[in-house]
């Protein structure tokens, strides 16, 4: 593969060009422009269960009206649910503020979209792909990686990297006028104070007014839940139970779901009634510049809370520590568009095999407003939490006796003695100032 020619800077006239088509202004104008300039556009739309999309079937029809040679709707929901569950099992979330995580819902969506749309293009012998991602964002690299992983012969053509397209249709007003001039009665939607991208797992709100840190979450109108910060919004406390079998969520409130898509939709409805899973994050983009986003993920948050409760009740401390360390690393790889790279697969396999397989049980929670909740009950046949081991009451057949603890504490003398010696060395070298005003207590002599 010749990297110098992977990215095409000019429209490939007379050739098939696949475009990830959303039906919005940008992709509509781009498709028509490519058609009029002599390319053969093929439109591919991913059904990701976007909560703000009313009629998926209308999108390919619209693409045909704008001049697509063919237009296909690709149902990506089952695969997206599968990847979302995998992320929950692995704790693949590296961005958090105050203990509230961003659930990497956009990166998960890009992993599914990038592979499934390019796979559909291969079926149609379309080997040139364009999408609406900008050069400043993460998606341009994510789609690049997933596209080439799926089709190594793929060429990339992005209208927003083509100077001719930018010169002719560089803004929303110009694109709207272009469509009208060509006989399409396109009416621009009223611009919001921010942009939104969503799929079944979550929604991302960013850019425009949200680029300013003095614009808070209150300017956002949630699309997956309620504005829990608004005192006029009535939110009643609600009990909900979540059941897992071998790391897979299978039931909500006692009702089993064979279809993971329906399971996620119901989890979104439950969590959304409370605004669960909304967060405000500052993160590092792939190119190391910081960006800010407001995120929604009610179902992911609900599953994550219940899953981690079971993890902490079932696994030992060292396993939990490794699960968290690996999850942070895996979350970053997912964010970077490396969800299917070997290093990510290695981390995923470790968590799914050795952590998730033991996670069977049910957690009952009370949801209130936003991320305010209480855990009411935890049940699992695999719990290693056994209260009688540490009961403050007198119990028959105690796991250990006072004499056992005396022996255990006596063994600690070895490392305590070594630690005292090290502190003395640090003091002599000037690294520590021992005595009055020191952060350490007075140790006396070194013996």
UniProtKB/Swiss-Prot annotation:
L-aspartate binds at residues 134, 138-139. It catalyses: L-citrulline + L-aspartate + ATP = 2-(N(omega)-L-arginino)succinate + AMP + diphosphate + H(+). GO terms for biological process: argininosuccinate metabolic process; L-arginine biosynthetic process; urea cycle. CDD domains: ASS. Keywords: Amino-acid biosynthesis, Arginine biosynthesis, ATP-binding, Cytoplasm, Ligase, Nucleotide-binding. The keyword Cell inner membrane does not apply. Pfam families: Arginosuc_syn_C (PF20979), Arginosuc_synth (PF00764). One of its GO terms (cellular component) is cytoplasm. One of its GO terms (molecular function) is protein homodimerization activity. Pathway: Amino-acid biosynthesis; L-arginine biosynthesis; L-arginine from L-ornithine and carbamoyl phosphate: step 2/3. It comes from the Bacteria. L-citrulline binds at residues 102, 138, 142, 195, 204, 206, 283. It is found in: Cytoplasm. Its EC number is 6.3.4.5. ATP binds at residues 20-28, 46, 132, 134, 139, 197. NCBIfam families: argG, PRK05370.1. HAMAP family: Arg_succ_synth_type2 (MF_00581). Belongs to the argininosuccinate synthase family. Type 2 subfamily. Homotetramer. This is Argininosuccinate synthase.
